[in-house]
Amino acid sequence: MKKVYLLAILAFLCADATAQGINFLYNDIRQAFNLARAQRKMVLVEVYSKSCEHCAAFEPVFKEKAVGDFYNQNFINYRLEVSTQDVQRFLTPKKLFAPSLPLFLFFDSNENLQHVAIINSTASELLRKGQEALTPNARTSNFRSRYAAGERGDNFLFDLAMYCRVVCDTAFNIKIMQEYARRTPVAAYSDKTNWLVIQKLLMDADNPMAKYLINNYSVFKTKYNPNEVKFVAENLLMSSLYSSRGARYDAAQIQQIRQGLVKIGIGTESANARTLLPEINYYFSKKQTDKAIARTEDYINNTKPQIADYKYIIGLFNQRATDKTYAPALKKWVNKALTLTTPNSPDAQILKQELAKAQR
């Protein structure tokens, strides 16, 4: 009993003390869970940023009496700022990711994630999501079983896809969004709802909606903020290329990424450079040294590689090529690289050593 009393006093001292509204704790998330166990409550963790305008829009909502009464009665409430050590200490070990801010995470007192919410800044939405967190069947942690049982409503799929993003279940997110894209009319891909879907939920450049975005880029730029459209399209392409899925891409798929980058206004030189390593590594894995040479020649002849670029590529050929047919081309690359440095520089010495390896 004494322990519960002391925890309550400590919570009061650490809380955001307001006459009404949600009482948030700060700075010690472990203390929040200790208090939750003592009071047999769940924990709401709001992940936010001090520089986030959408986060700031929730401030007056948090201060509403009805909101405060509900959350203070049912939850221990904690605010986690994304720039603090709480992210590394709490979210990262649990493999939790914040794809959008603010993010509302509801945990049981043993730190098990039960519910996820990304919502508009209204009291009704905040109260509704809190009530869902208190209702076991409504929690996002139970959505997989509901999906397995056949539930397929649009809003349900959206919530499940976001939950998958938060818990880093990329494979399930891709499956869900492929299903949604297949049943959605193509003519609706660029409407406001699906633009939000593309922005917030898609993780795969191979999704039909992602391909539509790339191939109809001008349509989206006309309807929505051009900078946001470019950011979303570029992120889809690059995150897919350098994901675990991207590591399994064949040459044609990598070339599609390169073409996609050009379509959205990334310069041809930059698109060439960004896709070089994945493509030549694919050729190395297939023992296609000739194609790796040709792709590298394309890069060197059409971009402006620096000395560091030459050193890396030359070293990579020495490490990964399965035959010595690349040696004549490598000699040519070394000679080009040497024009970018002084004869006896450390870089020149490294390049000459790499050439000697290739010629053995």
Per-range role (PLM):
Residues K63, A98-N142:
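Non-catalytic, surface beta->alpha helical segment in thiol-disulfide oxidoreductase systems
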Residues M1-N23:
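Bacterial Sec-dependent N-terminal signal peptides
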Residues Q39-C52, G315:
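Short active-site neighborhood of thiol/selenol oxidoreductases, capturing the structured segment around
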Residues S49-F62:
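Conserved redox-active cysteine motifs that mediate thiol-disulfide chemistry
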Residues I22-N27, V47, E64-Q88:
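Thiol-based oxidoreductase modules, predominantly thioredoxin-like and allied folds used
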Residues A148-R360:
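Oxidative protein folding and maturation machinery
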Residues F24-V43:
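A short beta-strand-turn-helix
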